[in-house]
């Protein structure tokens, strides 16, 4: 059998194939088979996307869980002669003069490990270890070749490792063990988002990709919101129970994922497993069963003649000029969006508004973006959507700074929400755009680097936000300028609207050359 990447899977169909005359006469590539069989979006496709997307729900819970487990607990005085809760410094009082509210010191990591008088660096060390683990894991896991395990197994292993480590956190006896386990959790889940996005995008047709990729993003936000409810119900319990309540369901989820989730048909095709790929398409689209049966009857079954496709990994981005240029530009844009997405909520304290209200509204404002993003993707091209969005977000950030200086707090806060809203829209747009720019063989690695740029941008946020302590709200101007300035690099990227996904680097190069020559999609 010839190279399965470029060779048409079926050159013609016989008269009894049940396919129309036009289809019988044209060469039928695997990409055409995927587009034809997944042209409709049924319940089973929605189920498969939601099943994989649930990994992001549990991922979100582990990202934000330290907001509750590592919180500084409230306390009250026992000896009012020497203790005044409104004026006393807890670290200057004898331990017998005060007590934690609820009478239990195990409600928080701070109280259980006696960190109430420790430095802010030590108290924040577990959270920092989590993000350091995410950065280290992102770079390390990006070195794994795309064809090593498969999309489904990568989602499964990352979620399972995160869940098991989260359960083991309850056995921590000191802050050092706890910090180490938080590092492992961050390392394990560092690429869960990337793995899930790639698996989902490769199991839908071009028509439905913009809407389908918004489902896991919505589940991510719901995971953050559900954590608040779980934490509220467990507020009188030890912080260890919160880890159990979020990680045990994730373990059961992994079992369902293993039993019911389907592998990416495009990845199976890249491995020469065409018959298995057709079986997956048949399960996902029962209405196209007759069409797919006609295809599978023509498949070559002798696997010994299959020529192994070349192995691709992150190094291919450096050996191909076009790939390196694209991934570099994508990372520049995502760095700017990452600074804004993670930094704007962090700097909200510089505006004279209720911090709890501002954080709640920042979370809620994300939900409409998952409805608006598909509309933008379907009606406008990718580059102009990203460009206009980042320019609007940048202008909103600068206006937030100016209005805050002028004392117009309420209007400034509205523009703060607008900046965060545009950052989230830009993130959603770039996620779909990036998937379409790279072939199946390196798509997972590209998504990892996309995610890493976002995380590195987020890691710079605390430093930028701290500037607001000296010049109030100036951080919003910096976030806005970064978003709009770096967002203009999108003009370098090729337009991908309406184009199907390629599988190999060679196929991507041929299509790009054809598009550049003919100027048509």
From Swiss-Prot:
One of its GO terms (biological process) is cellular response to salt stress. It is a multi-pass membrane protein. Induction: During drought and salt stress treatments. Residues 1-37, 145-154, 201-213, 263-326, 378-385, 434-447, 495-521 are cytoplasmic. GO terms for cellular component: plant-type vacuole membrane. It is found in: Vacuole membrane. Pfam families: Sugar_tr. GO terms for molecular function: ATP binding; transmembrane transporter activity. Its main location: membrane. Residues 59-123, 178-182, 235-241, 348-356, 407-412, 469-473 are extracellular. Expressed in roots and stems. In the stem of secondary inflorescences, localized to the phloem. Also present in flowers, specifically in the stamen, in the filaments and the connective, and restricted to major veins in leaves. The chain crosses the membrane at residues 38-58, 124-144, 155-177, 183-200, 214-234, 242-262, 327-347, 357-377, 386-406, 413-433, 448-468, 474-494. ATP binds at residues 200-207. Keywords: ATP-binding, Glycoprotein, Ion transport, Membrane, Nucleotide-binding, Transmembrane, Transmembrane helix, Transport, Vacuole. Glycans are attached at residue 79. Belongs to the major facilitator (TC 2.A.1) superfamily. Organic cation transporter (TC 2.A.1.19) family. High affinity carnitine transporter involved in the active cellular uptake of carnitine. Also transports organic cations. This is Organic cation/carnitine transporter 6. It comes from Arabidopsis thaliana.
